[in-house]
Regions:
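N-terminal helix-turn-helix DNA-binding core of bacterial DNA-binding proteins
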Residues: 24, 28-66
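C-terminal regulatory/oligomerization modules of transcriptional regulators
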Residues: 1-18, 128-153
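N-terminal positioning helix adjacent to the helix-turn-helix/winged-helix DNA-binding module
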Residues: 37-40, 56, 97, 108, ...
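Arg/Lys-rich, alpha-helical DNA-contact motif
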Residues: 105-140
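Residues within the alpha-helical elements of helix-turn-helix
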Residues: 63, 101, 118
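Canonical helix-turn-helix DNA-binding module
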Residues: 55-92
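Basic, amphipathic "hinge/linker" alpha-helix immediately C-terminal to the N-terminal HTH DNA-binding motif
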Residues: 90-109
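Residue-level recognition of specific faces of alpha-helices
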Residues: 44, 74-77, 83, 97, ...
Length: 153
């Protein structure tokens, strides 16, 4: 029978090794995050234009819970990327590219929400969760969501 001293000296069982995750490249991560932000902004701009006829920096800031300075900087980047147009102290408008991205983002969001609701997730929660999920779903997964939703009808 082992003594207490030998029990303390015994080595703990080795845990099985987890497979190594593929490396994440910081530049890729930054680019993906920038794309998420662009999608959120063009979606909000489209919603504001549809609801009030214009999208102002202050309205976007309120919707996102950020400062007007943050919005102004992001709008400059979106202008550089050809997604929005604006004049100083004027409303912000979507370009053709911005409108297309907005529509794609809105459709993606709706599919994710419908999929979550089909699993029994309440609407309020599905809307909130979709905001985080929609940017990270591959085209293949989105197509699988559509297929699943089509079978339910």
């Amino acid at each position: 029978m082992p003594t207490t001293a030998t029990k303390l000296k015994s080595k703990p069982k080795a845990r099985p090794r987890r497979p190594a995750l593929p490396p994440r490249h910081p530049r890729r991560t930054r680019d993906e995050h920038a794309q998420e932000i662009a999608q959120d902004y063009v979606e909000i701009i489209a919603e504001l234009i549809a609801a009030t006829g214009e999208a102002r920096v202050i309205d976007i800031a309120r919707r996102l819970g950020v400062t007007h300075v943050t919005v102004a900087r992001t709008i400059q980047r979106l202008q550089r990327d050809g997604l929005v147009t604006s004049l100083p102290y004027r409303s912000i408008f979507l370009t053709e590219s911005g409108s297309k991205l907005s529509e794609e983002s809105r459709t993606r969001h709706e599919i994710v929400v419908q999929f979550l609701e089909s699993l029994g997730v309440p609407d309020r929660v599905a809307q909130s969760d979709a905001e985080g999920i929609e940017h990270h779903v591959s085209k293949e997964t989105l197509q699988a969501f559509r297929k699943h939703l089509g079978r339910r009808k």
